[in-house]
Amino acid sequence: MAAKTLLKIAAIAAIAALGLSGAAADTRPRVLSAALPTPLPLPYDEAADAKADVAAAIARAKANGKHVLLDFGGNWCPDCRILAGVLELDEVEGAVGETFEVAMIDVGRFKKNLDIAEAYGVKITAVPTVIILDPQGRFVNAGHPTALSNARAMKPQAIVDTIFGWVSTAN
């Protein structure tokens, strides 16, 4: 009888040692290569109706139980283009689509669409500025919207970990 109990305890310990219980909790994509697309994307549509794009992303997120990723920037900004390139990597793009409804918001040279961020209490002082909302519309990365504004100094995995880390701490 004691041998069976010890065997069960050993089996549980082995499973725990393999990390199977923790693997399900971490859904961050793993960036297998650091090669970003070339040329880097130009993700911000200067002619877009940003308010309509944000409203549509929020509506889709609410309907689908996803988070919203609001990315404020400009095509002139290398950090913004690097962030967009990371989001387009094969190993990242699918997870982004499963987790987020994304709206890319052009701020020009800090002269337009700033009121959208201000509605969440964010004054845009650097780009990219990223606001993550949960499916109920709550701002989950408050205090850190410019964490990716130096994306060129970050490895792609660090960018992914930052974005998905905001989601995992919100759940």
Predicted regions mapped to residue ranges:
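Conserved redox-active cysteine motifs that mediate thiol-disulfide chemistry
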Residues: F72-L87
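Loop/turn elements at helix/coil->beta-strand transitions in domains of secreted/extracellular proteins
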Residues: N64-L69, E98-A103, A126-V127, P135
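Structural alpha/beta surface segment adjacent to cysteine/selenocysteine redox centers
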Residues: K112-A126, Q136
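Thiol-based oxidoreductase modules, predominantly thioredoxin-like and allied folds used
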Residues: A48, G85, L89-N113
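Active-site-proximal beta-strand/loop segments in catalytic clefts of secreted hydrolases
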Residues: F72-G74, I105-G108, L133-P135, H144-P145
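Non-catalytic, surface beta->alpha helical segment in thiol-disulfide oxidoreductase systems
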Residues: T125-N171
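N-terminal targeting signals for export/organelle localization
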Residues: A2-E46, N171
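A short beta-strand-turn-helix
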Residues: E46-V68
